[in-house]
């Protein structure tokens, strides 16, 4: 479970990085002045990205519960369909917050969506791949390669 907190911290660091990129004008937004930029960040980007992070954490938590319940089951490979189904929840959330904020993020929609997708990859895919228990840790897409990469960096798996 400590590994999922590590992926959450990495995701929050990247979130803060995107926040700084927008604030400092490195990624230009069609907002004039510091006041308009601060208003856009506090009204649109920050709440929507926190919603995506929260929903992704909830989906990860549900997956951990499912994998824990089937940790020694011989047919745990059947539970991978739940993993895919739970992945759709954060992706649907990304679509929803993007549609709701489309008028606010006209020229930066690609950058905002990119930051959302990074959160889902870090928290959900990598987090569940390295933190699932029992036999479930071997059935997720790319989990063996991710676990090998993470352990080669020196993080114990």
What are these regions (language model features)?
Residues 1-57:
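N-terminal signal-anchor transmembrane alpha-helix
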Residues 55-73, 122-136:
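Transmembrane alpha-helical segments in integral membrane proteins
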Residues 36, 40-45, 74-78, 104-112:
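Membrane-helix interfacial "entry" motifs
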Residues 78-110:
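Hydrophobic alpha-helical transmembrane segments of integral membrane proteins
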Residues 3-10, 47, 51, 81-85, ...:
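Alpha-helical transmembrane segments of integral membrane proteins
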Residues 44-66, 88-93:
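Generic alpha-helical transmembrane segments
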Residues 7-18, 101-157:
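Alpha-helical membrane-associated segments of multi-pass integral membrane proteins
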Residues 65-91, 143-157:
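Cytoplasmic juxtamembrane regions at transmembrane-helix boundaries
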């Amino acid at each position: 479970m400590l590994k999922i907190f590590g992926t959450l911290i990495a995701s929050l660091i990247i979130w803060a990085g995107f926040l700084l990129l927008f604030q400092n004008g490195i990624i230009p937004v069609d907002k004039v002045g510091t006041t308009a930029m601060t208003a856009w960040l506090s009204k649109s980007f920050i709440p929507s990205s926190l919603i995506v992070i929260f929903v992704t954490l909830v989906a990860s938590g549900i997956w951990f519960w499912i994998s824990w319940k089937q940790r020694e089951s011989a047919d745990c490979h059947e539970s991978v369909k739940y993993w895919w189904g739970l992945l759709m929840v954060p992706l649907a959330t990304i679509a929803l917050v993007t549609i709701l904020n489309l008028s606010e993020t006209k020229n930066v929609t690609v950058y905002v969506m990119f930051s959302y997708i990074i959160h889902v990859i870090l928290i959900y895919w990598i987090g569940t791949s390295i933190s699932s228990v029992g036999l479930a840790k071997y059935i997720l897409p790319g989990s063996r390669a991710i676990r090998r990469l993470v352990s080669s960096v020196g993080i114990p798996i």
